[in-house]
Design a protein with these regions (language model features):
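Acidic/histidine-rich, surface-exposed loop or edge segments in extracytoplasmic proteins
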Residues: 36-62, 120
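Active-site recognition of the HExxH zinc-binding catalytic motif
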Residues: 140-153, 171-175
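Surface-exposed patches in mature extracellular/periplasmic domains of secreted proteins
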Residues: 76-96, 157-165, 186-192, 218-225
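Post-HExxH zinc-binding segment in Zn-dependent metallohydrolases
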Residues: 161-203
Length: 249
């Protein structure tokens, strides 16, 4: 049996720069079909206009609604082949700037999505007055949260709060979309050690590596596997996409 955990170990020894460039090109090639897609109404609300973080945000993102729509289409182009695919309906995205702890989080449901972005995090990210660094971080965080709005979810295994596999898939895919679109600082942002069950960047870099080295459609197929492998599991999805000779255990 080919063991995916051995492939993952090899991944940790390989530089990821070429990986990110390759995946970004594939997403760019697929982007045009999403230009007219209805991403849902974008409602931007600044709940902390008195903060320095708010002032900084408006300077780097002068048209938040258009910017959010652009990044939403990037997410869609990464997760799906075309608007004809089975895509969760998103009617509205209420995006807020808030003077609270944390970084950013997605909430809501049934097509009404909420996302907050912390002005405190903006201020911390701008501590060195590095506009480019803050813009890079803001885009990366947004890609992650928008993925939660449009991604498919595992079926037959519980929920985000009750099942670790469900959680690892959801957070791993969100960071995979961020990795795939150059939203992290290349190999420097890749965690050392760990495995796919750690979710977030550890899983995200692994999923993108599988796309680059095993199947160029891996991210889209992995997302779609939640509809085709029920009850869903990492091992079942890997076999479904790459073949029965592969195992993740």
């Amino acid at each position: 049996m080919k063991k995916i955990h051995l492939i993952y170990a090899a991944c940790l020894l390989v530089g990821m720069g070429a990986c990110a460039a390759s995946v970004q090109k594939q997403v760019k090639d697929n982007f045009d079909v999403w230009k007219e897609y209805n991403t849902g109404a974008i409602l931007f609300e600044d709940k902390a206009p008195e903060t320095l973080g708010s002032d900084i945000y408006h300077r780097i993102i002068p048209d938040a609604e258009s910017y959010i729509k652009e990044q939403a289409r990037t997410v869609l182009a990464t997760l799906y082949n075309s608007p004809e695919d089975s895509i969760p309906a998103v009617h509205k995205i209420h995006y807020t700037l808030e003077n609270i702890n944390g970084i950013s989080a997605k909430g809501g449901g049934n097509g009404d999505v909420t996302i907050f972005y912390s002005t405190r995090h903006i201020e911390k990210s701008f501590a060195a007055n590095d506009t480019a660094k803050l813009f890079f971080e803001t885009r990366g965080v947004l890609l992650h949260e928008l993925t939660h709005a449009y991604q498919l979810e595992p079926q037959g295994i519980g929920s985000y709060g009750t099942n670790r596999v469900f959680w690892a898939f959801i957070e791993g895919m969100a960071d995979a979309v961020r990795v795939a679109n150059g939203g992290f600082d290349g190999p420097n942002a890749r965690p050392k050690g760990g495995n796919y069950m750690d979710g977030y960047r550890t899983a995200g870099y692994f999923f993108v590596w599988l796309r680059d080295n095993k199947d160029p459609e891996f991210l889209r197929k992995f997302n779609r596997s939640t509809l085709e492998v029920v009850p869903w599991s990492f091992d079942g999805a890997i076999k479904h996409i790459l073949g029965n000779e592969y195992s993740i255990d």
